[in-house]
């Protein structure tokens, strides 16, 4: 028996080594332009998606997530949420009380919606099959191994009332828009194949790549999001560099241009009453014989003063500044792939208790300072693994 176990152990090591030498993962580049109507809570957009099939497989179909379609009566998320507590899992009931019957009671203007009107691959219109929160694309030509294709999408949607993870008019924080999982997102493909997982409330699996996003929204709204703002001089609201003149274009809307390199997702939040605070952690420091170069680093805080304890958020930035040296000591220096004028940014936008690349959302300001501190120190390290 011992000899058999040793033999199997060596066999397992051999298979593992072989698998590792052939390791691969897909790669994407997203370029999106979105127009948001704050009166109807609807948006339209275009997406150009460069997709690299680095796998050894020929792909005859691709899949996209349409997450907002979960937030309407009769969806899988709605059905599951209304059954919570009735299904036995292990020693207890499967229970998550955050959704319950909130979806089934939504009115049509409160539903979530995500629709891809047209999808082209390399300029040719493709056949689409929508399965609630998953879009299946039947390709007219397969994507060969080690090749690249370009998808062009025209899409539209409606932002649902805040139910979970994403939405509008958060009943707790009062933040107007918390836009996570808001765009048609290509599903992950790995050694196990496609992962077209229907959205019923769990975590999100994505493909690493670059995002270039333009968001056109009412100019009264202040926005924070994944990535680095490319046009701060046209935006202002505290994003402009010291001494820089803000020159906003004419019209009722502003276009926020954000670029995020080497991340697996993109989110943003916006509200006309956001207060924007910044804290410069350091200027760039050149490398020495004993230490690596350090990039310039600024922390950004967006919060909405909705209650008497809103001043707790003002303590977050200095707390984050004190926590960062410990985090960098144990996890490494926070290094973006590229920098922009003003240096890399950590966005901390508070509304929804979620975290995404370069941005985290919370809604704990009504709690004690200690709870805010614990949440902050727990979320900042996420940036080191999400971008």
Where are these regions (language model features)?
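Short beta-strand elements of extracellular/lumenal beta-sandwich folds
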Residues: 41-54
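A surface-exposed beta-strand-loop module
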Residues: 52, 92-172
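Short, hydrophobic/aromatic-enriched beta-strand segments in well-ordered soluble domains
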Residues: 47-49, 66, 147-161, 211-219, ...
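Hydrophobic helix-coil surface modules that form long, contiguous segments used
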Residues: 186-193, 201-387
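N-terminal, polar/Ser/Thr-rich
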Residues: 17-44, 171
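Glycine/proline-rich low-complexity spacer/linker segments in large multi-domain proteins
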Residues: 76-89, 156-211, 281-282
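N-terminal signal peptide c-region/cleavage motif recognized by signal peptidases
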Residues: 12-14
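Solvent-exposed beta-hairpin/edge-strand motifs
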Residues: 61-124, 179-180, 216, 220-221
């Amino acid at each position: 028996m011992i000899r058999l176990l040793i033999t199997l152990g060596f066999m397992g090591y051999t298979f593992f080594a072989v698998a590792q030498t052939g390791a691969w993962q897909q790669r994407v580049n997203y370029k999106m332009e979105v127009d948001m109507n704050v009166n109807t809570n609807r948006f339209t957009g275009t997406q150009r998606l460069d997709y690299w099939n680095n796998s050894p497989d020929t792909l005859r179909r691709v899949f996209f997530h349409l997450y907002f379609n979960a937030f309407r009566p009769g969806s899988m998320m709605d059905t599951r949420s209304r059954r919570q507590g009735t299904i036995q899992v292990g020693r207890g009931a499967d229970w998550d009380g955050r959704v319950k019957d909130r979806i089934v009671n939504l009115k049509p203007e409160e539903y979530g919606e995500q629709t891809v009107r047209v999808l082209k691959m390399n300029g040719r219109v493709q056949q689409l099959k929508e399965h609630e929160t998953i879009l299946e694309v039947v390709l007219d030509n397969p994507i060969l191994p080690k090749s690249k294709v370009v998808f062009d999408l025209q899409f539209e949607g409606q932002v649902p009332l805040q139910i979970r993870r994403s939405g509008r008019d958060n009943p707790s924080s009062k933040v107007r828009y918390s836009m996570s999982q808001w765009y048609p997102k290509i599903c992950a493909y790995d050694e196990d194949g496609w992962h077209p997982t229907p959205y019923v409330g769990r975590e999100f699996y994505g493909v690493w790549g670059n995002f270039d996003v333009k968001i056109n929204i009412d100019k009264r709204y202040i926005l924070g999001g994944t990535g680095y703002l490319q046009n701060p001089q046209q935006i202002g609201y505290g994003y402009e560099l010291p001494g820089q003149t803000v020159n906003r274009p004419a019209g009722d809307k502003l276009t926020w241009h954000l670029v995020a390199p080497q991340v697996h997702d993109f989110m943003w939040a916006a509200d006309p009453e956001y207060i924007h605070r910044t804290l410069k952690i350091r200027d760039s420091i050149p490398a020495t014989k004993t230490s690596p170069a350090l990039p310039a680093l600024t922390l950004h805080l967006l919060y909405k003063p909705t209650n008497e304890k809103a001043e707790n958020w003002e303590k977050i930035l200095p707390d984050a500044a004190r926590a960062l040296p410990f985090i960098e000591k144990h996890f490494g220096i926070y290094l973006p792939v590229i920098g922009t004028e003003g240096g890399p940014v950590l966005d901390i936008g508070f509304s929804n208790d979620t975290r995404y690349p370069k941005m985290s959302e919370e809604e704990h300001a009504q709690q004690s300072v200690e709870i805010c501190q614990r949440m902050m120190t727990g979320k900042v390290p996420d940036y080191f693994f999400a971008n």
